[in-house]
């Protein structure tokens, strides 16, 4: 009997017992579907987490790690560490550094007419918007003159626009920040991402924050280098420059965000694998269900097996027939599970707010594993059918 004929007979058997076949495949469907959902959402979350942490390519973060002596004299040394404009100027002159992005943040009261809210006001330098992928929903972004002159203009988040203006356009309106007037020139697009939060925020030129609120230093500095080859040398020189400026030995250091993102990616990948493996237990349960039903099928078709053997069917042919029937059952369940997994991943991603990532390797793995389950758990029933004595089988009632 040819392979196609065996597959046709297997499909006929499945269709002849629709309800039993559906119930048998249920464990496989749930198992494959749950693994697809876990892996797809896990990989999507991992990718977004890595992107959120690493930011633009070839980026390092400057941070302050006080020594034991510094902490002993000032327990708040890390929180109070800053970067001066002189630091920024020196960093821009280091070979290999493409852009120096600096900012500082303070919590302030924002008021528009009778509406008032607490907002985070971020004083930024040029390049911050672009490097951090902040896009304008309406209005305009900052000009070079805004940064140089410290114009009293600001760009606000959608949450802040909603809190102060509701459905009215904020463009051109004046918001009072700690008693200082700031004209709204733009509204940001909502930022989506695993580490993105919908906050009430305003971005203003650093020079404006300096002149209006007395802010003199930056609290955060990141460096975008020309190429990956420059990360180590430029980062080392940058840390040395800032340490020299502040009279510290090794308190200011650099952090390669891409390396951190890669490390976190490995951890999330391990977690996804563990959770996926737990979800895969239902596949084993489904496999046991397939084996039980196939054993029942062998018992029900004992006379059929006896007739086939008396007509010349070999043990190998009987074994192949029942193995293919088992594989067809699990394969159909696997394909349905993949479809449900796609839908489930899309639903979870829509609720969680990050994309799912379903690779062809995952799909192929689901198909192959389903077939493997069919072979493993179909072997016992198929072997039992193949070993039946034709005379005893023909006597079976």
Swiss-Prot record:
Domain of life: Bacteria
Main location: membrane
Molecular function, one GO term: identical protein binding
Induction and repression of expression: Expressed in exponential-phase cells.
SMART domains: CBM_25
Keywords recorded for this protein, A-Z: Cell membrane, Membrane, Transmembrane, Transmembrane helix, Transport
InterPro entries membership: ABC3_permease_C, CBM25, MacB_PCD, Macrolide_Exporter_MacB
Membrane topology reported for the UniProt record: Multi-pass membrane protein
Transmembrane segments: 22-42, 270-290, 327-347, 362-382
Gene Ontology cellular-component terms listed: membrane raft; plasma membrane
Keyword Transmembrane helix among UniProt keywords: yes
Protein location: Cell membrane; Membrane raft
Record text on subunit structure and interactions: Part of a complex composed of YknX, YknY and YknZ. The complex interacts with YknW.
Record-stated family: Belongs to the ABC-4 integral membrane protein family.
Function: Part of an unusual four-component transporter, which is required for protection against the killing factor SdpC (sporulation-delaying protein).
Protein name: Uncharacterized ABC transporter permease YknZ
Gene: yknZ
């Amino acid at each position: 009997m040819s392979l196609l004929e065996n597959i046709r007979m297997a499909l006929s058997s499945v269709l002849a017992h629709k309800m039993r076949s559906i119930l048998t495949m249920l464990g496989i469907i749930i198992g494959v579907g749950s693994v697809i959902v876990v892996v797809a959402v896990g990989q999507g979350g991992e990718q977004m987490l890595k992107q959120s942490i690493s930011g633009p390519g070839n980026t390092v973060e400057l941070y302050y790690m006080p020594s034991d002596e510094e902490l002993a004299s000032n327990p708040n040394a890390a929180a109070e560490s800053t970067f001066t404009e002189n630091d920024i100027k020196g960093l821009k002159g280091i070979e290999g550094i493409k852009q120096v992005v600096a900012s500082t943040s303070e919590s302030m009261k924002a008021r528009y007419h009778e509406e008032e809210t607490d907002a985070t006001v971020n004083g930024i330098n040029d390049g911050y918007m672009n490097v951090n992928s902040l896009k304008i929903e309406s209005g305009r972004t900052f000009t070079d003159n805004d940064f140089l002159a410290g114009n009293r203009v600001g760009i606000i988040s959608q949450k802040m626009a909603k809190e102060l203006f509701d459905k009215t356009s904020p463009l051109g309106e004046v918001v009072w920040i700690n008693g200082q007037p700031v004209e709204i020139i733009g509204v940001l697009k909502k930022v989506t991402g695993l580490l993105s939060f919908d906050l009430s925020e305003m971005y203003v030129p650093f020079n404006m924050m300096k002149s209006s609120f007395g802010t003199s230093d930056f609290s955060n500095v990141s460096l975008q280098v020309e190429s990956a080859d420059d990360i180590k040398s430029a980062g080392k020189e940058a840390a040395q420059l800032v340490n020299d400026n502040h009279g510290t030995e090794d308190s200011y250091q650099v952090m390669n965000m891409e390396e951190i993102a890669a490390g976190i990616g490995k951890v999330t990948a391990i977690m996804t694998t563990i959770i996926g493996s737990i979800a895969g237990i239902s596949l084993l349960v489904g496999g046991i269900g397939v084996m039980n039903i196939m054993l029942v099928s062998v018992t029900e078709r004992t006379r059929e097996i006896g007739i086939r053997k008396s007509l010349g069917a070999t043990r190998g042919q009987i074994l192949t027939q029942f193995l293919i029937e088992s594989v067809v059952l699990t394969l159909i369940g696997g394909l349905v599970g993949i479809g449900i997994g796609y839908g489930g991943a899309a639903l979870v991603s829509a609720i969680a707010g990050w994309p799912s990532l379903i690779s062809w390797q995952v799909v192929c793995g689901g198909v192959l594993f389903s077939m493997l389950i069919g072979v493993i758990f179909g072997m016992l029933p198929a072997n039992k059918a193949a070993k039946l004595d034709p005379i005893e089988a023909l006597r079976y009632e």
